[in-house]
Structures are given as structure tokens and as C-alpha cells.
Amino acid sequence: SELNIIGQDITGYGMDTSVKSQLAGLLRKIINNTPNVGWIRLLYLNPQRVSSELLELIADSPRVCKYIDLPIQHINNRILAAMNRPITKDEIVALIKKIRKTIPGVYLRTSLIVGFPSETEKEFKELVEFVKDVKFDRLGVFIYSREEGTAAYKFKGQISQRIKQERFDQIMLAQREVASEVNAKFLGRTISVLLEEKQDAGFLGRSQGDAPEVDGLVYVNTKQKLQIGKFIQVKITDTLEYDLVGEPKNESC
């Protein structure tokens, strides 16, 4: 089974009574009080409040998914400021390096917004290059939507829907290439998979690197009678655009 700790910003937990996040303490209590839960997954972490204590706890806890969802939205400093995000490109880069150093083999996910008012072609290209360079394991992209009542609604430099769509497509193309490279590393490897659905050819499941509904799947080809909700070891035999294909380890040659 899997327990998801989810919120728009779970690193804000406890900040109504303290000057710093209490998420690490909460996670420690959950680990100690849920011995029958196979995976514990955190969704989502504010880049400004990811502590060393939290990262070390994730790294040291076998049942906590080595999965960090870090919604950065953009990487250009001017756009970040316009979005009212008090963090810089250098700080984001440093945090990503720290996460990957502290949690070896971590799955790193982010979400981005393209077409924010006044985003120039140069600023957008900076974002594309960042996606190519950092190689997020998982990535979601949203097209900026002008919503009445928001601060950005009145911003000058609103971008046409055509350009916003073009930018969305460019980011997705860049990430498809990254995803192909990321998935290729799993060929021949054996990973833990949580079985979720029976299919004609076998089962659908998820790896530790795949959050429910937003990430990829693992197609498990088998004629065995396996139990939904259980974990099995799967040897990866093929890759799809965002998904993996494999078979139970005891069936592999």
C-alpha cells in the first residue's frame, strides 16, 4: 500500500506555530506509526523550505519514496519575481544539486508554467535549456491562464494563445527526449512495483518514481495470479515514451 502526504505546500506544515517547517517531525511520526504501509510519498515541496533535515530523513528511510516533487514554475529570475516567487535561478540550481547529492537515485519532478505575461522568447529559451540540462525525471507543464482577480490579470504583455501553445509544445518535446534517456537507464534493472490494476496481458503498476495519476506506469507482463495492492520485483525489459515494461523477476530468464 501507499500513503500520500499531499498539499499545495506541505513544507508549510507547522509554520502557523513555528518559524520553520515542522514537516520532518511529522514525517518521522508517520514512519514510526505506519509499519504496514509500504511506501510514503510527499507531494508537494516548496523549494524555499526544503530543509537538510527533511532530505536526510527521506534518504535514510527505506519506506519513504525517493521522489521529490519540486514545483519551480520557471527559472528566469525576472519571471520568478513577476510570479511573486522569492527564489532565484542560482538558489534553485543549488537546491537541485543538494537533493541529488543527499538522496542518491532520487526521482526529481517539477512543474512549469509557460506563456506568463511578458515572457520573452529569450526567457523562454532559458527555460528550455534548463530542462535539457537538469534532466528532471518527471515534468509537468501548464499554459498560463489569465484569471480575473489575480495580480497577473492586469499585467502588460499578455501572450497570444498560439505562442503559448507553441512554447508548451517545445517544452514537452524537450522533456520527451529527457524521459527517453531517463527510462533507458532502467533496461535490465529490477525495481519494486506496486500493482494497481489487472489487464489482459498482466498488470499495471507504478514504481517509486511514479506518483498516482500524474506520472508514468509500469506494464507487468505475466500470467501469474498476483494480488492488487502488493509489491513485486519487476525486471524491466522495454521502455515506452513515459512508461516501463517488464515481467516479475522470477519469470525472467
Stretches found by the model and what they are:
Residues 1-13, 68, 90-97, 101, ...:
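Proteins enriched for Cys/Gly/acidic motifs involved in redox and nucleic-acid/cofactor modification
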Residues 1-121:
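Conserved SAM/AdoMet-binding glycine-rich loop
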Residues 54-55, 127, 220:
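Short beta-alpha junctions and helix-cap segments that line functional grooves
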Residues 14-36, 82-83, 146-177:
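Radical SAM enzyme [4Fe-4S]-AdoMet core and its adjacent flexible, acidic
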Residues 7, 44, 72-74, 110-114, ...:
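Active-site proximal loops enriched in glycine and acidic residues that flank catalytic Cys/His/Asp
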